[in-house]
Amino acid sequence: MVIDTSALVAILTDEPDAELLEGAVADDPVRTMSTASYLETAIVIESRFGEPGGRELDLWLHRASVALVAVDADQADAARLAYRRYGKGRHRAGLNYGDCFSYALAKVSGQPLLFKGEAFRLTDVAAVH
């Protein structure tokens, strides 16, 4: 699976669906996250909880054995295409910059995407069930 920022923020902030999302992570032996999404998640978490929040993020990723995947040229191209097709102001999905990198890693790797919300459901990316 590819983990999107929305899912990880929900887990780290103990939102009502956090347990369900963590269960999905536990059930999938493949756990990846784009380095672009990692930065986006760190920005969100550290803006709310400071550096201790960032340490909790890193600890969670370590304990869950999530592999951070560097953005390469193929992913950058896929992210660009995602924005062209599904970007904010262009499509109802309204993908933002960070969303495009989660989408791209899922498409390039062939892994389903774990996310919260409805935006990705309006795209052609496979979702974690």
Curated annotation (Swiss-Prot):
Pfam families documented for this protein: PIN
Function, in words: Toxic component of a type II toxin-antitoxin (TA) system. A sequence-specific endoribonuclease, cleavage occurs after the first AU in the consensus sequence AUA(U/A); RNA secondary structure is probably important in substrate choice. Cuts in 5' and 3' UTRs. The TA system acts as a post-transcriptional regulator of carbon metabolism; in M.smegmatis 3 TA systems (VapB-VapC, MazE-MazF and Phd-Doc) may be involved in monitoring the nutritional supply and physiological state of the cell, linking catabolic with anabolic reactions.
Name assigned to this protein: Ribonuclease VapC
Subunit structure of this chain's protein: Forms a complex with VapB.
One GO MF term: RNA nuclease activity
Entry-linked InterPro entries: PIN-like_dom_sf, PIN_dom, Type_II_TA_system_RNase, VapC_family
Source species taxonomy: Bacteria, Bacillati, Actinomycetota, Actinomycetes, Mycobacteriales
Principal EC category: hydrolase
Source organism: Mycolicibacterium smegmatis (strain ATCC 700084 / mc(2)155) (Mycobacterium smegmatis)
